[in-house]
């Protein structure tokens, strides 16, 4: 008799995605981050749901409701810190996932890649709005500064900002709508994840060698289910260590001060995972130019498939491109550091140099190096 998982309409979908899915035998642990991201999303939705039961999205009570969750709700503190630090784990996994896609040429599956870019924007928007909800000083001023960037859009900018704010400043209406969107977006992200997987399973997974792996496949279960479970356990262990030993390590102390529109903090900065983009924004003295650079720093991922000039798909056998890739990683770490520093010498010039280098590596150095490697292959 045929197994029910292969005949039942619903189980068949699960079976084809998680059990009998053929996977290249050479995929390494860098391919684990998709499942880690799914685990992160599940943790965020679950903890967020329970936090939303106790949170109030009103400027008068938002800060106190978060304090109430931490002090009075059973295990509320662990829910709050799991959610806050879970976002950090989410972005660590997300950036490694994108980095793996760049290194191993996964962007050649353009539909999957483009949905991935949409997902990245959606997760960033969700995280930004979530940071506003505790209504501390950095929440309020972060929301004010970042939403104000839209005023750089010619003609409609000012009206657009006031429309988003629901008034003439970040206030009660802003907080309420941000909470509504912050609750809604993760479910949209979950739907996009399904589309992302749908496109991925049309082509099958890429592999470290970059050559077709049709003759050499293994079933997803048990090999990759065990591998993914191990990865998830390691990630949850790291998250637990962070939550239980130093929950405020990645947060800003200013966010423990209730929002005060009359008192501007000396250094307004977003969470660590946005600092690289914030540094690029600040490195351009012109407001509109800065906003364009900020958007392009992520949107540039969309044109990477067009800039692929190499005859080989992955960087596995391309040492010059590997050097450039790790230079890009170092540059992003430099930008992250600069984003957290005050706007003064020498940080300004370092930020500007790192910002120029970021775009130069992607737009110029990588395609040229790939073309040069093609030429060297003829020798």
From Swiss-Prot:
Co-factor binding comment: Binds 2 heme b groups non-covalently.
Assembly, per entry: The cytochrome bc1 complex contains 11 subunits: 3 respiratory subunits (MT-CYB, CYC1 and UQCRFS1), 2 core proteins (UQCRC1 and UQCRC2) and 6 low-molecular weight proteins (UQCRH/QCR6, UQCRB/QCR7, UQCRQ/QCR8, UQCR10/QCR9, UQCR11/QCR10 and a cleavage product of UQCRFS1). This cytochrome bc1 complex then forms a dimer.
Role: Component of the ubiquinol-cytochrome c reductase complex (complex III or cytochrome b-c1 complex) that is part of the mitochondrial respiratory chain. The b-c1 complex mediates electron transfer from ubiquinol to cytochrome c. Contributes to the generation of a proton gradient across the mitochondrial membrane that is then used for ATP synthesis.
Positions that bind heme b b566: 97, 196
CDD domains: cytochrome_b_C (cd00290), Cytochrome_b_N (cd00284)
Membrane topology according to the record: Multi-pass membrane protein
Family: Belongs to the cytochrome b family.
MF (Gene Ontology): metal ion binding; ubiquinol-cytochrome-c reductase activity
Domain of life: Eukaryota
Biological-process GO terms, alphabetical: mitochondrial electron transport, ubiquinol to cytochrome c
Keyword annotations of the record: Electron transport, Heme, Iron, Membrane, Metal-binding, Mitochondrion, Mitochondrion inner membrane, Respiratory chain, Transmembrane, Transmembrane helix, Transport, Ubiquinone
The name this protein goes by in its record: Cytochrome b
Binding positions for heme b b562 per the UniProt entry: 83, 182
UniProt-annotated binding residues for a ubiquinone: 201
More info: Heme 1 (or BL or b562) is low-potential and absorbs at about 562 nm, and heme 2 (or BH or b566) is high-potential and absorbs at about 566 nm.
Cofactor: heme b
Main localization category: mitochondrion
Transmembrane segments: 33-53, 77-98, 113-133, 178-198, 226-246, 288-308, 320-340, 347-367
Cellular component GO terms, alphabetical: mitochondrial inner membrane; respiratory chain complex III
Pfam family, any one: Cytochrom_B_C
Compartments in which it is found: Mitochondrion inner membrane
């Amino acid at each position: 008799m045929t197994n029910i998982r292969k005949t039942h309409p619903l189980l068949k979908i699960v079976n084809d995605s998680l059990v009998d899915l053929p996977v290249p035998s050479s995929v390494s642990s860098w391919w684990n981050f998709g499942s880690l991201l799914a685990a992160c999303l599940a943790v965020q939705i679950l903890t967020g749901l329970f936090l939303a039961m106790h949170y109030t999205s009103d400027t008068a009570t938002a800060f106190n409701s978060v304090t109430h969750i931490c002090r009075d709700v059973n295990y509320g503190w662990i829910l709050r810190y799991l959610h806050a630090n879970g976002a950090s784990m989410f972005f660590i996994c997300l950036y490694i996932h994108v980095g793996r896609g760049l290194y191993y040429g996964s962007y050649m599956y353009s539909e999957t890649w483009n949905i991935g870019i949409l997902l990245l924007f959606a997760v960033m928007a969700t995280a930004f709005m979530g940071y506003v909800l505790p209504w501390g000083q950095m929440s309020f001023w972060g929301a004010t500064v970042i939403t104000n960037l839209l005023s750089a859009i010619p003609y409609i900018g000012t009206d657009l900002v006031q429309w988003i704010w629901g008034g003439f400043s970040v206030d009660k209406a802003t907080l309420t709508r941000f909470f509504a969107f912050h609750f809604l977006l993760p479910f949209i992200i979950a739907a996009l994840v399904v589309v992302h997987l749908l496109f991925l399973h049309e082509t099958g997974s890429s592999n470290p060698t970059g050559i077709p792996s049709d003759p050499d496949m293994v079933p997803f279960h048990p090999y990759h289910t065990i591998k993914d479970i191990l990865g998830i356990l390691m990630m949850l262990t790291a998250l637990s260590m962070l939550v239980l030993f130093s929950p405020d390590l990645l947060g800003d102390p200013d966010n423990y001060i209730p929002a005060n529109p009359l008192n501007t903090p000396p250094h307004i900065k977003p969470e660590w995972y946005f600092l690289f983009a914030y540094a690029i924004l600040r490195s351009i003295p012109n407001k509109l130019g800065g906003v364009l650079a900020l958007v392009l720093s992520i949107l540039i991922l969309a044109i990477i498939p067009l800039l692929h000039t190499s005859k080989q798909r992955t960087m596995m056998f391309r040492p010059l491109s590997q050097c450039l890739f790790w230079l890009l990683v170092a540059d992003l770490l430099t930008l992250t550091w600069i984003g957290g520093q005050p706007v003064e010498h020498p940080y300004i010039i370092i930020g500007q140099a790192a910002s120029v280098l970021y775009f130069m590596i992607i737009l110029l150095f990588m395609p040229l190096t790939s073309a040069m490697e093609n030429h060297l292959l003829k020798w």
